[in-house]
């Protein structure tokens, strides 16, 4: 590997250490229905989002709750020795994209057939820490003031 690629790979590795991401692929619900729950929890603190997902009756709520718990576990692995409550975790980004569609045929009157699209989706959830962002902004302000 060339030196330029090696440097870029090292920079990429360092940036991945500070990202806390969980992915859910091929979730068998329609993206539109999942986006309703994703929009409800976007930008909220982790504890508040868990409460909303736990008591919601929507089909995608338990899956998103499990995904959020997975992202929290990823944060815990990368930050051993830190307390989750002190870091003020929140949902920085949640993205629901369309996945693979299963196309089925449903019989219709007069010898016709209607196409049924069974949709799926992919969900990407990223956590952020309000404490880390506050310290980063104060450090950047200190550098600008000098």
Where in the sequence are the language-model features?
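Structured, basic alpha/beta domains of bacterial-type, RNA-associated proteins
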Residues: 2-25, 29, 36, 40, ...
């Amino acid at each position: 590997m060339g030196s330029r690629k090696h440097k870029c790979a090292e920079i990429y590795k360092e940036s991945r250490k500070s990202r806390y991401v969980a992915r859910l692929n091929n979730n068998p619900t329609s993206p539109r229905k999942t986006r309703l729950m994703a929009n409800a929890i976007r930008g909220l603190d982790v504890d508040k989002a868990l409460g909303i997902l736990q008591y919601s009756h929507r089909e995608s709520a338990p899956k998103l709750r499990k995904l959020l718990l997975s992202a929290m576990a990823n944060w815990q692995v990368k930050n051993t020795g830190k307390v989750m409550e002190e870091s003020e975790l929140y949902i920085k980004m949640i993205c629901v994209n369309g996945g693979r569609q299963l196309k089925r045929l449903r019989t219709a009157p007069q010898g016709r057939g209607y196409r049924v699209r069974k949709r799926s989706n992919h969900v990407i959830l990223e956590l952020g820490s309000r404490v880390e962002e506050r310290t980063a902004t104060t450090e950047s302000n200190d550098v600008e003031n000098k």
